[in-house]
Amino acid sequence: MSANDTFLAVFLGSKTSTKMAAWNALPEAERRAREQRGIAAWKAWVEKHQAAIAAMGGPLGKTKKVDSNGIADIANEMGAFAVVRASSHEAAAKLFENHPHFAIFPGERVEIMPVLPIPGGLEPSGTARVVNLGERELTA
């Protein structure tokens, strides 16, 4: 793999989407059955792509925005994240084709982007950038 083989995957979905409205309209028993099917499918996805998953990431909570006006609560579409390693951007994206996030659950999409080197020499030369993501440390 190249030096630029690390990718951030962001799982997105809107609480006001038609998919979420349809999900919320399901009878409780059907929704629970789909949740169980979705959890099983997600576990199978993790097992299938275990070698490519650098960090499982996880669900994301409520968002705070910080800008020149201060701190404020905001809503966004981000629901979870993961970090994967792949030989190319295209290969990283292919890992998420038909992912349960949108194939079973009411998520809308997964966006995948390369994790780039920090520009302008902000990292001390000769050191690796280490990101602690829960159980694993990812060295880029």
For every predicted segment, state its role.
Residues 1-140:
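Conserved, structured core segments of small domains
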